[in-house]
Amino acid sequence: MGDSRDLCPHLDSIGEVTKEDLLLKSKSTCQSCGVSGPNLWACLQVSCSYVGCGESFADHSTLHAQAKKHNLTVNLTTFRVWCYACEKEVFLEPRLAAHPPGPAPKFSEQDSPPPSHPLKAVPIAVADEGESESEDDDLKPRGLTGMKNLGNSCYMNAALQALSNCPPLTQFFLECGGLVRTDKKPALCKSYQKLVSEVWHRKRPSYVVPTSLSHGIKLVNPMFRGYAQQDTQEFLRCLMDQLHEELKEPVVATAAALTEARDSDSSDTDEKREGDRSPSEDEFLSCDSSSDRGEGDGQGRSGGGSQAEAELLMADEAGRAISEKERMKDRKFSWGQQRTNSEQVDEDADVDTAMAALEQQPPETQPPSPRSTSPCRTPEPDNEAHMRSSRPCSPVHHHEGHAKLASSPHRASPVRMGPAYVLKKAQVPGSRRRKEQSYRSVISDIFDGSVLSLVQCLTCDRVSTTVETFQDLSLPIPGKEDLAKLHSAIYQNVPAKPGACGDSYVAQGWLAFIVEYIRRFVVSCTPSWFWGPVVTLEDCLAAFFAADELKGDNMYSCERCKKLRNGVKYCKVLRLPEILCIHLKRFRHEVMYSFKISSHVSFPLEGLDLRPFLAKECTSQITTYDLLSVICHHGTAGSGHYIAYCQNVINGQWYEFDDQYVTEVHETVVQNAEAYVLFYRKSSEEAVRERQQVVSLAAMREPSLLRFYVSREWLNKFNTFAEPGPITNHTFLCSHGGIPPNKYHYIDDLVVILPQNVWEHLYSRFGGGPAVNHLYVCSICQVEIEALAKRRRVEIDTFIKLNKAFQAEESPSVIYCISMQWFREWEAFVKGKDNEPPGPIDNSRIAQVKGSGHIQLKPGADYGQISEETWVYLNNLYGGGPEIAIRQSVAQLPDPESLHGEQKIEAETRAL
């Protein structure tokens, strides 16, 4: 794709350049000060062979360019070219290919025939996170942009700043913007993408006004309308759920076979699960942070460039060795959960058997586990497979009951769960529901983890296991007594019962509340050592994952014993997320009052280790996390102010984001903060070395006969994830191995071309695939799409014709009822809004059975009226039932003349 980057007028001043010359110069030293590489710069002016150091030393390369008026220089480590006059990167690929003496570049047209499809040239870009770590014209790092307060919107600003400083998510919206496509309103992903682009723009303003995103979130959830203070954690959940809904894509079934074919250590990180919400803050038993996100399980593109981008945009995370100012030249240009069911695994089996059954399923084909609001924390664990309602397209309903709390920071709303149905799956009335489809999005790829919840009967030792997906962990803050129990349990290696931890601040009357308030004031004026050990984040995690006894009013209903039994309940992490979101439960809301737990919780800036909390079946190799950002709340439960502390990924410094004001702070300020929400990122030196190795392979520029297309989205994961998982090219391929027709017109936004040596290295390291050397539209999908379009057209035309006849009928002999819930699904399908046809007609929601066994319409039911012909037509297509008629055939009315005669006779009789 040609663009202005190819039009540098100074290219004519370049002499002959060959790969051998550049490699030879890369081993030399600065001709002014004698310093050796890496990151020397070579002048490209005709007849000039000067090699100078960069800004990590004395920057003689820049001094030479200014003194000699030589505009073009090339970095001898990354082989990227900078023009001082144009102040931008330029690309030499077309020019290099034109010089016969030099070796043909590895991606020249001689190496492989031009594609047979009308694709624009696909850029060769292996972009590293560091590539986006470029700086301003004034040498200030990017991302230091404030956000204007729109009226008590600090909760939103703090949350957005914290998310903005999560590199995997930000890089997706910056580098993979072409994947941000949705037809769902209010297109919040577009608003968020625009906001991120403004915040991280090279010419960033001092602050931005997030009006569009604020308006969109208010459309999604009415709770955020008005100007009342809200809870930043509720905002985060709502925002990420909506982003997931808008960006989710179905998981291609054949992708599972790819993970089986490769023996990759990191394959589990690519496991596709639908997104889920975090749990209620009301109860603390043992696993209270699983949540219900609904039908999306969890994993986008950057605008393409021209073939000239074959210049290899791979930035080095080794760039840590390059000075940050050096990156201005080197990278300045580069920024241009559904699921409805909690997966209860083999309830009647022992845990080993259950886990064996789970492991037999490839990660990408396992049934989506819901973000159910913590079945493991319900007072009485239900042994049935819990059926949760799928996440609505708009999370509005999750908050309706809590608008009254809008004036104060909210707890993690218990209404985040869907209603738990009392029917087992086998009891769902005769309708076969649509086959459940697994979904993933960038949100679920980054934030989704899973926990294994186990409940053991202490009488028969039966163990029930449930796999749940979480988006964040809501941790209780242990009190002094709970802390002593936890430490005692840790040192004695015995299970602790943390149940009281979550309730320690709950069962308080007014008097207890006043006493507690006075105590807190005294504590705040007294040195912390006087009160004993400080609560740590590890203590909160230990309290969360500790075993919980089920006895008394909270006994376990054992399926095997068929009785209420004493039991024990605990959970372990089965899969770690790439970014771990931790929510500390500081707010308690009672009927008459609310209050805030202001206890300081110390947290590590680096090296948070979750190994003690992992299940033995956990396949995540990287278990340590480094802090990215922390959201703090200053004030009380009724009022206050949110700010965020974030580490800038460019220079590693910490900054305070207080609405439109951004201030650099020392890390000790962060450590002493009253944390409310924390974002941790997996840390791995091995991942950094892996990126450096790929940079080196790409810099070799070996000629290759084959070019390999790789998913731009997966490449972004490779550049920003510690465990990217197997290569997943099914983000741009269909199940038949071709390009889906609906993606063909923007395929250059979905793929990146890699040289053969880079592909072979990535494939041998991560597995996955499949290998793609040729892009073509899938003819099978095209036929299926045409057949589907024809089916839709026939169904909707037939319905319209039958309905018109029904409307024209003055006195229909019979009227049939149809569930509007099913009808809306069918309507979305025939109008092209949903690719999946509805399941069988399900009138069970609008039907009730009388004592005689007669089925009739339920009062207040959500139904529509259709003719008998329409019912027969739809029932023949989809099946289902039951059949409900609200008006049966009526007896024939008497003839008006005979009626008049009868009236006359009756009148005469009365007269006599």
Swiss-Prot record:
Q: Which residues bind Zn(2+) 3?
A: C43, C48, H64, H70
Asked whether the keyword Repressor is assigned, the reply is no
A GO cellular component term found in this entry reads: centrosome
Task: Give an example GO molecular function.
Answer: cysteine-type endopeptidase activity
Q: Where is the composition biased (Basic and acidic residues)?
A: 260-280, 322-333
Q: Which UniProt keywords apply?
A: Cytoplasm, Cytoskeleton, Endocytosis, Endoplasmic reticulum, Hydrolase, Metal-binding, Phosphoprotein, Protease, Repeat, Thiol protease, Ubl conjugation, Ubl conjugation pathway, Zinc, Zinc-finger
UniProt zinc finger (UBP-type) residues = 6-111
Tell me the residue numbers annotated for binding Zn(2+) 2: C30, C33, C53, H60
USP domain: which residues? 145-683
- Functional description taken from the UniProt entry: Deubiquitinating enzyme that plays a role in many cellular processes including autophagy, cellular antiviral response or membrane protein biogenesis. Attenuates TLR4-mediated NF-kappa-B signaling by cooperating with beta-arrestin-2/ARRB2 and inhibiting TRAF6 autoubiquitination. Promotes cellular antiviral responses by deconjugating 'Lys-33' and 'Lys-48'-linked ubiquitination of STING1 leading to its stabilization. Plays an essential role in autophagy induction by regulating the ULK1 stability through deubiquitination of ULK1.
Q: What is this protein called?
A: Ubiquitin carboxyl-terminal hydrolase 20
Q: State the species of origin.
A: Bos taurus
What gene name does this entry carry?
Answer: USP20
